[in-house]
């Protein structure tokens, strides 16, 4: 009976040691992401790209012939 108790304690200790050496679990990763301030998270989610198009700033689009195009931009503005 005493041997069973000792083996159980040994297994529990080894489990804790190996758990602390391992990679972070999914729950730990989510907790780290949730700990970011909401302003940082919001800023990364709402990244805007503004292009000056005839004096009017275009967001999320390209400037072609001084008119803003929101979709199907053939090239990325700023890259030759």
Curated annotation (Swiss-Prot):
Give the organism the record lists. Answer: Terebra subulata (Chocolate spotted auger)
Q: Which UniProt keywords apply?
A: Cleavage on pair of basic residues, Disulfide bond, Secreted, Signal, Toxin
For this protein's source organism, the top of the classification is: Eukaryota, Metazoa, Spiralia, Lophotrochozoa, Mollusca
Report the GO molecular function annotations. toxin activity
Q: What is this protein called?
A: Teretoxin Tsu6.5
The signal sequence is: 1-21
Is-annotated flag, keyword Metal-binding? Answer: no
Q: What's an example GO cellular component term for this entry?
A: extracellular region
Tissue specificity note: Expressed by the venom duct.
């Amino acid at each position: 009976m005493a041997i069973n108790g000792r083996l159980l304690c040994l297994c529990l200790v080894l489990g804790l040691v190996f758990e602390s050496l391992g990679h972070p679990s999914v729950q730990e990763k989510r907790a780290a992401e949730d700990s970011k301030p909401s302003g940082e998270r919001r800023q990364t989610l709402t990244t805007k790209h503004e292009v000056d198009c005839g004096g009017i700033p275009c967001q999320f689009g390209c400037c072609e012939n001084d008119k803003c195009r929101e979709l199907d931009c053939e090239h990325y503005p700023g890259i030759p």
